[in-house]
Amino acid sequence: MKQVFESENISYVGVTEELIPDYLVMVNDIEHVDRFIGGWHEPYTAEDEARWVREQLESNAVVFSMIEKKSGSFIGNVELMDVSDTVKEIGIAITAAKQGLGYGKEAVTAMAAYGMDTLGLDRIVLRTNTDNFRAIHVYEKCGFREFRRTEDHVYMEKVR
């Protein structure tokens, strides 16, 4: 796995078929999966994840797998999804075993910096469920501010 960039405790590598077993554990975790994959119905298969990896690589998506530096273990994925040329939406998914250890804050901060400094973005947006108070707090600590709220979602942004 080739490292693209790093932060204090995390190496950010391109998505790879090598991590499919780790991806499957994360996306098929019924207790935690609905927070980052809306409308989850059926368990994902290795073929589903292989297709996803291929699609990400073929489209040059800005998505990275996060690897814990000290152990080499998989933490989760973080991505910047297209909104426009200068605005992207950040998304993050962390395995249940690595939640609550500060990796979310570190990864969102690092990915926002990568987006603005390396990709030249002017604005990064995100959305989360209105009842995901822990995530909202983390995003605020990363410099994101709420700009819109609906019954189901909080929309936040970080502007250069």
Regions found by a protein language model. Give the residues of each.
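Acetyl-CoA-dependent GNAT
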Residues: 39-91, 95-97, 150
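A short, well-structured alpha-helix characteristic of acyl/acetyltransferase catalytic modules
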Residues: 1-46, 50
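Conserved G/P- and acidic residue-centered "switch" motifs that form tight phosphate/ATP-binding loops
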Residues: 72, 102, 132
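Conserved acetyl-CoA-binding loop-helix of GNAT-fold acetyltransferases
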Residues: 94, 100-114, 136-141
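A generic structured-segment signal
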Residues: 89, 104-116, 145-147, 155-157
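C-terminal "cap" of GNAT-fold acetyltransferases
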Residues: 122-133, 141-160
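Hydrophobic adenine-recognition pocket in adenosine-nucleotide-binding enzymes
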Residues: 15, 94, 128
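Amphipathic alpha-helical recognition patches that constitute DNA-binding helices
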Residues: 22, 89, 93, 134
